[in-house]
């Protein structure tokens, strides 16, 4: 980009020393847009590529500080890589389908499409205020017909390869949002990830994707992700939940040919099994004829359905069935237990109360025997004793026949081997991961491209008939938008196979389906014939730097990895993993004032004394907490108001300086003002530099100052470069401040060329952090091209070498003086300089010098 005439020095006379960020920023944002400065260089094959991407936002309507942090971090990294001469792809789009938009539209009585598009326009204008180096030509929203056409296309590709199926299943039902949730969308307390509702169970026919076909690859390939946070990889590993163990076969005493298979990771505790627990839907229940037991079971099912949020781990029903322990032929009771899940293992577990806390509590409440078979110390603890809790540590076997005395890990192997030989045990691997349920019973989502025919069953829509569009004219009631099944004209269609009357699938896809491939679309965002160009994906992917919240670790990130592998296997591209390097930024927090008596939060507007905050309603002392910004806590900060007051560059500098990116950031007005003052000082220094010709007086030149500034320049280049590469943006700004201090204290003492070179390099180093002020100063210095088209300076290692060192002077082994000497000084010159120094003379006068020992670079010892 060449500056046009209206940006040169003549038309930008700054008549005072005031830094006016809004004027500067508005001007340069307009110029950058007009000149298309950040357009992706799609055609360059010689340059190394860099794909920088933030997790795209849901268009809620307003930018918040969490957004700002995410996009500023990504922008800094993108700008830094552009300075390295790389070809940059830095796009932005919108995760636009989903329940929040539908619910907001219901509240306002408007079409969610209109609501979403309005929000996108507003948020885009807010994002542009930040001066992001985004290529807006790549922009799309997942609700665009020319995007969800390709979501449907990819669904059909997965269907063709056998990764899509439909089955009746007990599903997680959100009673507030009236839709199904995937397992990953239910939190540890059994609540919806979005609405917070207690999740219920329903039996529905649903569509699934076979993510379990890729379980082992998803797990093993975590090792390839060396530049991902370890905690994210651990979260995915735990969610996949690989368990190595064994299936143990227990015979049923009452039925000669009936057996029950139980999965366990602890064969070493087999001698301690005192009951078998089965789920409420286990097939073995069909063998029970006792009406009293069956009646209790029905009551338990009703209770569980009504009390899903309650702790039911101790609820059990004894049956009249007995199992035979294969290791010792002991007879053990079979219980129906609420804590046993149908979908885990075989829907049955072996109860070992002495060595599993859940089993221990169940046994205690139901008066079941507890038999200890592992002790901590085999030398001092020869017998069992009354346990207060289950013993779950490693140890040595007791009460286990010929396995007594073995450490439990060795016993696992030997017991399993015996079971394999005798036919009652087999090695087994289990996974916690379940197939991805993608059906949703709402309007605002991507329609599933399936036609249901009474003759032919479920038939995929012909690809040439995509997209299956959402009905435009919709019915909005007081509390819902009617689901797709309500639009009869839309539902009616013909079967593509037999031509008979048929109906469309009325479920929409989980919005995570749309967001699990969007990064593949950006390199070919305008392509009209396919979702993406294979060559473009192979060129630009994987994403070199992905930035987003850790809350997406087992939802978006896992789904995106799965979909990438599945589409690779459909020969759509050749990459294995979508994201090379992942940065999960911390939350932005601000002070919230809470009345601990009432639990209510008080608005800062109602607080008179912030040194001693009290509730104006009852004078209670308020607790000051730093919490995630929220409207309900009155601690939200509007980014637009901050930008209008201080400028985008100040907001960027604060966000990057206040805390390391992976840590939570605490908002502080004084810290924002501190960054603003720093930019003001930079601005004033530039004006002083530009307006003071007297600085070029050779009488002021100081060789030592010039050497010091040269060294500072190179230290800054080296340290800031390393800090950005290591995501240490706060320390990079600290180095920038040190460079500023050196520059400002040296200006009048150094020659013109060095001064200009220092300012040039300072501008480039500043540019990724504060791009507007750097561009303005660069332009006013007189450079014709944008600073953002420059190359990053390279530090000179030689300039960092010391030209002198501190020599410690000892007399008879005691330190008496210190002196700075040049690194090339001779020993004779050292003696001349030191022996005449007053602090040395007073210790050697009238004494005989026996010898002088000089260790160059360190010490001089005079022996007298």
From Swiss-Prot:
Q: Which UniProt keywords apply?
A: Aminoacyl-tRNA synthetase, ATP-binding, Cytoplasm, Ligase, Nucleotide-binding, Protein biosynthesis
E.C. numbers: 6.1.1.4
Task: Write down the top EC class of this protein.
Answer: ligase
- Reactions listed under catalytic activity: tRNA(Leu) + L-leucine + ATP = L-leucyl-tRNA(Leu) + AMP + diphosphate
Q: Which GO terms describe its biological process?
A: leucyl-tRNA aminoacylation
What's the family?
Belongs to the class-I aminoacyl-tRNA synthetase family.
**Protein name, please?**
Leucine--tRNA ligase
Tell me what gene encodes this. leuS
């Amino acid at each position: 980009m060449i500056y046009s005439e209206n940006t040169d020095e003549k038309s930008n006379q700054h008549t005072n020393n005031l830094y006016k960020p809004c004027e500067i920023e508005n001007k340069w944002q307009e110029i950058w847009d007009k000149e298309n400065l950040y357009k992706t260089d799609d055609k360059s094959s010689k340059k190394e590529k860099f794909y920088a991407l933030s997790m795209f936002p849901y268009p809620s309507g307003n930018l918040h500080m969490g957004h700002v942090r995410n996009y500023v971090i990504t922008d800094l990294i993108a700008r830094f890589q552009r300075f390295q001469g790389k070809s940059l792809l830095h796009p932005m789009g919108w995760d636009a389908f989903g329940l929040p938009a539908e619910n907001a539209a219901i509240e306002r009585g408007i079409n969610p499409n209109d609501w979403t598009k309005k929000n996108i326009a507003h948020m885009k204008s807010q994002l542009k205020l930040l001066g992001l180096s985004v290529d807006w030509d790549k922009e799309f929203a997942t609700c665009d017909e020319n995007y969800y056409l390709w979501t449907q296309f990819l669904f059909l590709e997965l269907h063709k390869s056998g990764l899509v199926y439909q089955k009746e299943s007990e599903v997680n039902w959100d009673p507030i949002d009236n839709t199904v949730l995937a397992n990953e969308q239910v939190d540890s307390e059994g609540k919806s990830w979005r609405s917070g509702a207690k999740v219920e169970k329903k039996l529905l026919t649903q569509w699934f994707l076979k993510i379990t076909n890729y379980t082992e690859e998803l797990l093993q390939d975590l090792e390839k992700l060396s530049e991902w946070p370890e905690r994210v990889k651990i979260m995915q590993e735990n969610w996949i939940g690989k368990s190595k163990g064994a299936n143990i076969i227990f015979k049923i005493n009452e039925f000669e040919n009936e057996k029950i298979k139980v999965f366990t990771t602890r064969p070493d505790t087999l001698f301690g099994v005192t009951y078998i627990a089965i789920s409420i839907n286990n097939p073995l229940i069909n063998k029970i004829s006792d009406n009293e037991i069956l009646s209790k079971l029905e009551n338990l099912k009703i209770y569980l359905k009504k009390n899903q949020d309650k702790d039911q781990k101790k609820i059990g029903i004894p049956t009249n069935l007995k199992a035979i322990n294969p290791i010792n032929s002991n007879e053990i009771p079979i219980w129906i237990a609420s804590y046993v899940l149908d979908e885990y293992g075989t829907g049955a577990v072996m109860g070992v109360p002495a060595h599993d806390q859940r089993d221990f509590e169940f046994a205690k409440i139901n008066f079941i025997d507890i038999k200890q078979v592992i002790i901590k110390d085999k030398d001092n603890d020869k017998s069992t004793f009354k346990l207060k809790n289950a013993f779950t540590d490693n140890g040595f076997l007791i009460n286990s026949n010929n396995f007594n005395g073995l450490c439990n890990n060795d016993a696992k192997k030997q017991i399993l081997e015996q079971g394999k030989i005798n036919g009652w045990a087999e090695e087994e691997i289990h996974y916690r991961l379940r197939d991805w349920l993608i059906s949703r019973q709402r309007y605002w989502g991507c329609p599933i491209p399936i036609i249901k025919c009474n003759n032919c069953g479920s038939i995929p829509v012909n690809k040439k008939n995509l997209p299956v569009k959402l009905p435009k004219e919709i019915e909005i009631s007081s509390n819902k938008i009617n689901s797709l099944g309500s639009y009869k004209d839309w539902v009616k269609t013909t079967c593509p196979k037999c031509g008979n009357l048929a109906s469309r699938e009325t479920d929409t896809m989980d919005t995570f389906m749309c967001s699990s491939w969007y990064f593949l679309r950006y390199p070919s965002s305008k392509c009209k014939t396919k979702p993406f160009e294979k060559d473009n994906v192979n060129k630009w992917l994987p994403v070199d730097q992905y930035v987003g919240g850790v809350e997406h670790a087992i939802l978006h990130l896992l789904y995106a990895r799965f979909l990438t592998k599945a589409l690779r296997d459909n020969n759509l591209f050749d990459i294995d993993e979508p994201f090379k390097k992942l940065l999960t930024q911390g939350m932005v927090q601000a002070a919230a004032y809470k009345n601990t008596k009432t639990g209510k939060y008080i608005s800062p507007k109602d607080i008179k004394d912030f040194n001693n905050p009290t509730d104006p309603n009852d004078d209670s002392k308020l607790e000051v907490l730093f919490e995630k910004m929220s409207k309900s806590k009155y601690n939200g900060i509007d980014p637009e108001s901050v930008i209008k007051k201080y400028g985008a560059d100040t907001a960027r500098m604060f966000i990057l300086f206040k805390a390391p990116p992976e840590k939570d950031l605490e908002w502080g007005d004084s810290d924002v003002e501190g960054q603003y003052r720093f930019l003001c000082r930079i601005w004033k220094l530039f004006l002083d530099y530009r307006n003071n010709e007297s600085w070029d007086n050779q009488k002021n030149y100081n060789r030592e100052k010039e050497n010091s500034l040269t060294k500072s320049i190179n230290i800054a280049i080296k340290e800031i470069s390393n800090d950005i590469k290591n995501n240490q943006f706060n320390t990079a700004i600290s180095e920038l401040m040190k460079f500023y201090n050196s520059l400002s204290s040296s200006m009048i003492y150094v020659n013109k060329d060095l001064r200009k070179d220092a300012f040039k390099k300072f501008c480039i180093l500043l540019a990724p952090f504060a791009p507007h002020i750097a561009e303005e100063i660069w332009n006013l210095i007189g450079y014709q091209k944008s600073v953002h088209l420059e190359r990053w300076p390279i530090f000179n290692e030689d300039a960092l070498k010391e030209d002198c060192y501190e020599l410690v002077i000892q007399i008879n082994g005691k330190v008496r003086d210190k002196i700075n000497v040049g690194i090339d000084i001779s020993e004779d010159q050292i003696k001349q300089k030191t022996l005449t120094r007053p602090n040395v003379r007073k210790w050697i006068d009238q004494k005989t010098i026996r010898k002088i020992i000089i260790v160059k670079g360190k010490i001089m010892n005079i022996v007298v």
